[in-house]
């Protein structure tokens, strides 16, 4: 008997063999491909966009995987992109933000005054095309142990109203989706990613050698400041957490990852999965050095195993061999060189081959490696889904 898409995903997450490999689309819920397909939707009308992700995924015949981020997580959303909580104020956390724009890039410069001292940060929003934005903390707020201590002592925690609000934001998406797929949420990143949003990455990548005390305190704070948000997201009715782990990529090497990063990342995964909700660990860069290391996370799934030559270094056949079913492999047809820039025939050929490699033994979900880009031919996306489903059966 054929499974529903929801049953299909859940079976794979439980380590069971479904009726066929789940075939899904990674569509970001603002800008990019969704803006291409629905240019008249307000890019800040998050619910409407998320409903359109469901609509187009259904139309194309995919098992729907809605990845909630935009509008779902305010005020944590801005901390997710980088920096401190400048949305909330208390008597001991006074925020002054100056906003400037050149018509394309908006820069928010914040000064945060506390009884113990002042912190500063800069956050940039770059509209790379109408309706598509890039976000980054371009001036990191933590430079010293003293700065770190100010954050630990004075940054406001999760607002009391937030758990109910995030439940209200998830509920209509869950209801609209039904059994046609799963609702995922971009939960707090792993602590190394969270740390990279507070301190300069050039310092972070060697800090476990140059200043191990600072590094340890930074990791502990990076876990502590998002714990309540993680629990609230988990209780909001989602089906899967997506946990960012791209900052500690394969270029750091297996030894550095296992000795200095893995134990902290595992704690965030344990928290996310504490009530039985599965998590997907997301590393969209170099990954082959860490494929076996990720077994130590205890995570249910890892994505997206971006293929070479442009996106990453993943060798899917080698990945399946190394993983051996210890976690679900989610990936990974090249969304740029194949789906965006290739012909329909290219898409069909690569998709069929990827399914042929990934399907045996189960523990596999097929999707475009990372989110679909603006300018992707819809006929290529249709060919990807159709070809994948044709070859997906067990």
Outline where the language-model segments fall:
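Glycine-rich, flexible loop segments associated with nucleotide phosphate handling
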Residues: 48-50, 106, 315
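Amphipathic repeat-derived elements
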Residues: 81-95, 280, 288-290
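Segments that shape or occlude catalytic/ligand-binding pockets
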Residues: 34-91
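Active-site loop segments of alpha/beta catalytic cores
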Residues: 1-46, 113, 118, 122, ...
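Generic hydrophobic, aliphatic-rich segments that mediate packing or membrane embedding
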Residues: 53, 106-108, 169, 200
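Intrinsically disordered, low-complexity segments enriched in polar/charged residues with Gly/Pro
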Residues: 82-86, 96-100, 192, 236
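Short secondary-structure junctions
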Residues: 66, 95-96, 136-139
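Serine/threonine-rich low-complexity intrinsically disordered regions
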Residues: 88-127
């Amino acid at each position: 008997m054929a499974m529903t898409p929801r049953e299909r995903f859940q079976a794979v997450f439980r380590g069971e063999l479904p009726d066929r490999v789940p075939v899904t689309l990674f569509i970001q819920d603002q800008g990019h491909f969704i803006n291409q397909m629905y240019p008249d939707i307000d890019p800040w009308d998050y619910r409407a966009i998320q409903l359109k992700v469901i609509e187009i995924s259904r139309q194309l015949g995919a098992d729907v995987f809605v990845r909630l981020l935009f509008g779902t997580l305010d005020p944590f959303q801005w901390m997710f992109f980088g920096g401190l909580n400048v949305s909330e104020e208390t008597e001991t956390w006074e925020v002054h933000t100056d906003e400037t724009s050149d018509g394309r890039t908006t820069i928010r410069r914040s000064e945060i005054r506390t009884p113990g001292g002042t912190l500063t940060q800069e956050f940039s929003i770059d509209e790379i095309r109408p309706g598509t934005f890039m976000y980054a903390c371009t001036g990191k707020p933590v430079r010293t142990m003293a700065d770190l201590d100010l954050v630990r002592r004075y940054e406001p925690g999760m607002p009391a109203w937030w758990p109910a609000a995030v439940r209200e934001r998830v509920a209509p998406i869950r209801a609209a989706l039904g059994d046609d797929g799963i609702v995922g949420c971009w939960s707090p990143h792993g602590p190394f990613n969270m740390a990279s949003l507070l301190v300069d990455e050039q310092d972070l990548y060697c800090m476990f050698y140059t200043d191990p005390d600072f590094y340890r305190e930074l990791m502990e704070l990076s876990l502590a400041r998002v714990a309540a948000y993680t629990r609230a997201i988990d209780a909001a009715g989602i089906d899967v957490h997506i946990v960012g782990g791209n900052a500690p990529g394969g270029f750091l090497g297996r030894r550095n990852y296992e000795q200095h990063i893995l134990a902290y990342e595992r704690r965030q995964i344990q928290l996310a999965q504490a009530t039985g909700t599965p998590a997907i660990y997301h590393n969209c860069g170099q990954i082959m050095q860490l494929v076996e290391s990720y077994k130590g996370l205890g995570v249910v799934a890892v994505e997206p195993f971006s293929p070479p030559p442009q996106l990453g270094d993943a060798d899917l056949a080698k990945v399946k061999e190394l993983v051996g079913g210890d976690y679900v492999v989610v990936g990974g047809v090249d969304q740029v060189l194949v789906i965006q820039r290739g012909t329909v025939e290219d898409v069909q050929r690569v998709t069929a081959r990827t399914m042929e490699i990934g399907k045996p033994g189960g523990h596999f979900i097929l999707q475009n490696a990372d989110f679909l880009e603006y300018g992707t031919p819809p006929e290529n996306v249709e060919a990807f889904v159709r070809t994948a489903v044709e070859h997906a059966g067990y």
